[in-house]
Structures are given as structure tokens and as C-alpha cells.
Amino acid sequence: YDVAILFSDILFPLESLGLKLDYAPGPVFNRFLNENDLSAQISSTEILESNKFQAEALNITRNLLPSNKSLVGFVGGPWTLLSYGLGRKDENKITGIEKNSFIERALYDVLIPMLREIIKMQLDNHSEIVYVFDTNAKQLEKDYFIQNYMENLKNNIFSEFEGKIAYFCKDNPLLSNPDNISDYGLSGMVFGKNDGLEKFLPNLNNGFIQGNFEPTHLLKPRDEFEIELDHFIQNFSRLSTEERSGWVCSLNHGVLPKAKEENVKRFINRVRTVFDQLED
């Protein structure tokens, strides 16, 4: 392996707002967020106290890792947290947010400041960077995502931890321009699309881009999986070493629960073998 990641469930911060989280087997809340949950001011001390297990886990992990292995942190994106907290995680698109004062207060006055504290805590406890996993931000209208939501994240999180945040959103509009990584002060982004990374990568000037093997391929029988893997490797083998610079080879999303372990191992071994040979 090359890097260890603190994979702490992204929904824990919602418990600080009064929701009770359970798993059956997926996440289930006893209720959803309401106005009363936003009225009580949550202090930095309370936020850090309720999430201090993350700092402890990071310190333990760092002490166990060899010095040549990296350690990165992990939080949920504010919109993704809110979509779960409102019980709206399965909706395709959510519109009219600029007219909904409750949603905007929850986002900008509560969740973003809360996540800023948690990110700082992780960075102060040996995380080299922190991934912001915001897959449900795809629910936002493109104009609102760029002009309102991302501007707020840029001003209140990305700029405060410049070069220390990696951002993931499914179908991320920022992937239209590789320069957005540096323009938003990010360390990198995850390429949450199935196609196009091999065209994006040669234009990358700063930071890293991660992806983008489709996770569902890992569920397939060996022969079908091998076809997909061959196609993936061929696409990136056509690029020069310089053009591949900044690429973190991975899936375009997380590993699915029923992924075949032999396919995961095969993916890692084939990718390393092929691209190590190309580097020689």
C-alpha cells in the first residue's frame, strides 16, 4: 500500500446537532433536522470533544505506519451531510436552495464551521491532507453549486487549509477545467466520472487527480473484469510519463460491499506492474 486513510463515518457530526445515528445495516436516524437543532450554539470545544476519537485514531495509526507511508484524513462534505440530515439523500436534484433560509443557515452557519474545526483537528493530528467526500453535492443546480456553494467552501475551508484539501463530488462541475484545483486552493480532486480522465490528465498543471476505474467492474466475473481492466490500462498507457504526472490511480468512487477480493488484488497488481515497467 502507499497511503493509509482514516475512514470515519461521515455522518457522525450530525450527532452533535442532536440526531441519533444507528445502522440497520445502513445509516438510520431517529428523526431529521429541524429549526430547533440550529438554535443552540455548538462550541468548538464540544465539536472537538465529540470527535476526538478521530484524533486518537490518527495518532495511533501514524505511530504504526512506516515513515515512508502517508496518512490522510476524511470528512463528509457539508451538503452531503445535510442531505442525509434532512432525509433527502435519494433525491436526484434539489432546487430553490437560495430561497430556503433554513437550508442555507444549516449549511453556511452550522455545518461548514463545524467541519472546519474537524478538518483542523485531523490536520493537527498527523493527517497530511483531508479528503472532503461530498458525493451528494451533485444534487445541487450547477449555477448554485459554483457561485454559492463552492465559493463558500473556498472562502471558509479551502483557503484556510490551502493545499491540504482534496475534494470529491459525483459529476463535479469543477472537473471542466484542470486549473480549478489550484484556483480553489485544493491539493487535488477525485475524478468522479467514468470517462474523460485520460484527456483531463495531460492538462493538469498543479495538484493531483484521482480515479477513475468504475467500482462496479470489481463485481464482475474474472473474464469480464479483465476486459474492463485491459481497456482502462490501455487508455492511460498511451500517455507519456509526464502526462501521467499527478495521477493517483484508483476507483472513481469507493469500493462496493460485494466487490470480489480477487478482482481488487488483480487491479492493484496489474496497475503497479504495467506502470512500473513503463517508468523504467
Language-model features: where?
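Aromatic/hydrophobic pocket-lining residues that form the small-molecule binding cavity
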Residues: 51-54, 58, 108-111, 115, ...
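Catalytic-face loop-and-helix region of soluble metabolic enzyme cores
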Residues: 157-280
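Short beta-strand segments at enzyme active-site cores
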Residues: 4-8, 71-74, 123-134, 164-170, ...
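Active-site-proximal loop/short-helix segments
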Residues: 10-21, 74-96, 125-148
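Alpha-helix-loop-beta-strand connector modules within alpha/beta enzyme cores
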Residues: 30, 50-69, 142-165, 203-204, ...
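Active-site-proximal, glycine-rich beta->alpha crossover segments in alpha/beta enzymes
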Residues: 22-121
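N-terminal glycine-rich cofactor-binding segment that shapes the pocket for flavin-like pterin cofactors
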Residues: 3-4, 9-53, 202-208, 212-220, ...
